[in-house]
Amino acid sequence: MKLNTNSNSYIIIYSAILVVIVAFLLAFVYQALKPMQDANVALDVKKQILYSLNIRNLDGAEAEAKYAEVVKSESEQNGQKVYQCSVDGQRVLVVSLKGMGLWGGISGYLAVGSDGKVFGAYFNHESETAGLGAEIKDSQEWQEKFIGKKIFDEQGNVVLSVVKKVDDPQTQVDCVTGATLTSNGVNDMIHDGLRPVMNEIQNAVRESLTETSNDSTAVAE
């Protein structure tokens, strides 16, 4: 019996078989590539953390090695990831940040030095406007404006902020030109991200001060 390739039943069966084959191939390719994709995502996170520690321009292998050298532990405090790091003998806490910009999600890592000031910062975005809001990621110069800024006051309140006009250069950073709403998102993200881990940051600063005092006493003796 000759197969009627023009019949509706043939077309439906043929199409169904093709769909099954394509779906199988896509699933196979996805599973085959997933470990590589996961590794790339993990490496990107490590690089962003290193950027916040002012360690940049490393290739994949170098970044992996440097991350293993400086990041001593990772924990989660009140829903916030905190990385305990050591850079040139200085204890540094890196806090992960997530928030909303003008057009989508934004994220970042803020490194806190043992003096309670910003050691470094790195920010990322999903869909901010190139040349405007995207500068939170693309402008290393803007990120470096955070370095040395005071993070909290004597009462433990977060005072680090991104503002349109700087009145207090010790705690404030100029917003990105032409991107006030994205900058406001960065400001909110910093405050929302730091509040849950403020106790840990303050404890780390106190411990560092105690260690410094003990070292000074030991040298004097």
Predicted regions and their residues:
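Flexible, solvent-exposed loop/hinge segments and secondary-structure transition points
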Residues: 2-221
